[in-house]
Regions:
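Extracytoplasmic copper-binding redox domains, predominantly the cupredoxin/blue-copper superfamily
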Residues: 13-142, 146-206
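Bacterial N-terminal signal peptides
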Residues: 1-8
């Protein structure tokens, strides 16, 4: 279970602030936050065009959060060849051995978490979180996500590559109501999974 603190809000446009903490109470940077309206009328986020490069045998950036329908270019800036793949249900694809930028952008049409790897370099790891939520982002170094939302009821969810909980345990509802700011603090009930031994640093390290 997640402990939560809610201070609700009043105008049609309001500031939503989400604080995410680990089970030990420390702030959790790099977590993905999504806020989905529970009532109709919300806008659907426009697809984006993103780039995930390969530099020094690592994905750069190593985690992207994008709306459904977005496309990602996967250039290879290394002097060695890479072979990117994903077996995730939300997007299965493979880009055979290449350097430079020989392939067109990959389209991500389905919501879900897509795990990326390289068939040549096992240490390479990245994630793409594809969402239908109109409001999304990642927590900063202080474990906080801040966004502007319209007044209403929302389901807020968090995701992190090392979470143990099931998805249902990581969602909470809140109302942005009568003030111009709403805050929610989410604290994990269990420690994160340990980082893989010998793995290189990532943007979601804790």
């Amino acid at each position: 279970m997640l402990a939560l603190l809610l201070l609700a809000g009043r105008v049609p446009a309001a500031t939503l602030v989400i604080h995410v903490q680990g089970a030990d109470g420390r702030v959790l940077p790099g977590a993905v936050v999504t806020a989905r309206p529970l009532e109709g009328g919300a806008h659907r986020p426009a697809p984006q065009h993103a780039v995930m490069d390969q530099v020094d045998r690592a994905f750069v950036p190593d985690l992207l959060v994008l709306p459904v329908g977005s496309a990602i270019e996967f250039p290879n800036s290394d002097a060695v060849s890479h072979q990117i793949y994903s077996f995730s249900p939300a997007k299965r694809f493979q880009l055979p051995l290449y350097r430079g930028k020989p392939y067109p952008p990959v389209l991500f049409e389905q919501a879900g978490v897509v795990t990326l790897g390289c068939n040549i370099h096992d240490e390479m790891l990245a994630y793409v979180v594809v969402t239908e939520a109109p409001y999304f982002g990642r927590t900063d170094a202080a474990g906080t996500y801040t966004g502007e939302v319209v007044r209403g009821r929302y389901r807020v969810a968090i995701w992190h590559p090392r979470l143990r909980e099931e998805a249902a345990d990581l969602e909470r509802e809140l109302t942005v109501g009568e003030t111009d700011r709403a805050e929610l603090t989410l604290r994990l009930s269990r420690p994160l999974l340990p980082a893989p031994l010998g793995n290189r640093p990532h943007s979601w390290d804790y």
